[in-house]
Regions:
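Single conserved hydrophobic/aromatic residue that forms the stacking wall/gate
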Residues: 271-283
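Divalent metal-binding segments
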Residues: 2-6, 11-58, 62-269
Length: 283
């Protein structure tokens, strides 16, 4: 059974615009005039009158960290609360109260930028986040993704002290000889590795959130790198999450994955699996 759309202004990628198109089994099978569409219609087909509306194909994001984006949407949205340090801390505190976490879970936020602070001329530090909580580990990532800050509870769990060596390709922020809660670039990896590993259902929630947000902007396909985002999560688990969402009709963005593997075994296993199909591609 086809769905026929007619009486529109449809851009197919070429000019001139056409009036109608038809979709069958999730694929475009026709584009042309409304008269041709009427002639194509068969018993049982659904016909939609576009009423002169403009239609174009969905947008593609060619550099999209989809799973990471979905994860960020489930954190405190600090980008909307970065006019001041106080605004940022209030956002984290409100998020903590409105989103109860299971035992051991960290309070996460992303999007702050000290360049926009009007009350202080510096980055936030561990002592600032301690005002939100000294019992719950907190991690707040800067808008750029190359810096984060944690509170004292998180530093305790990480085991970072004044004697912790500086990592290659990164930096642990220090003040008066003590770690101040800031981590830069490669120094961030141990922090993320210490955060409890998300379950497959939590990964599916991240993908759902990302798809919903992308669809709201008209994005229906993307190139991503999700297999190595959560290093403690096997790529197979991420792929299973995608497959299950596809099977349930919830995967509304076509994804082409960059495998980004560092070992030949995983690479060969991926390419001999059933990871790829119409909605999920791999490279």
């Amino acid at each position: 059974m086809k769905t026929i759309y007619k009486n529109g202004a449809v851009y197919t990628g070429k000019l001139p615009l056409v009036e109608a198109f038809a979709v069958e089994d999730g694929k475009f099978v026709f584009a042309g005039s409304s008269a041709e569409a009427d002639a194509l219609a068969a018993a049982g087909d659904k016909v939609v009158d576009l009423g002169g509306k403009f239609v174009c194909s969905g947008f593609n994001d060619s550099h999209m960290h989809l799973l990471n984006y979905g994860s960020s949407l489930l954190k405190a949205q600090l980008a909307a609360h970065t006019e001041s340090l106080e605004d940022m801390l209030a956002c984290l505190d409100t998020f903590q109260k409105e989103h109860p976490r299971k035992d051991g879970a960290w309070l996460m936020g992303r999007g702050w930028n000290q360049d926009y602070f009007t009350d202080v001329d510096r980055m936030p530090n561990r002592y600032d986040l301690d005002r939100v909580s000294t019992e719950v580990p907190i991690c707040a990532t800067r808008a750029c993704g190359h810096c984060l800050v944690v509170n004292s509870k998180a530093l305790e769990l990480l085991g970072v002290t004044a004697d912790t060596p500086q990592p290659e390709g990164g930096e642990i922020g220090m003040e008066n000889g003590e770690p101040d809660g800031r981590f830069f670039d490669n120094a961030m990896e141990p922090v993320y590795d210490s955060i409890p590993v998300p379950s497959k259902e939590e990964i599916k929630d991240m993908i759902r959130s990302a798809c919903k947000a992308l669809n709201s902007y008209g994005v229906t396909s993307s190139q991503s790198d999700d297999y190595c985002v959560c290093r403690a999560v096997p790529w197979q688990t991420v792929n299973e999450a995608y497959k299950e969402l596809e099977d349930s009709g919830e995967l509304t963005v076509r994804v082409y994955e960059q495998s980004n593997f560092t070992d030949l075994e995983s690479f060969c296993l991926l390419y001999t699996s059933d990871a790829a199909d119409d909605l999920i591609g791999v490279d």
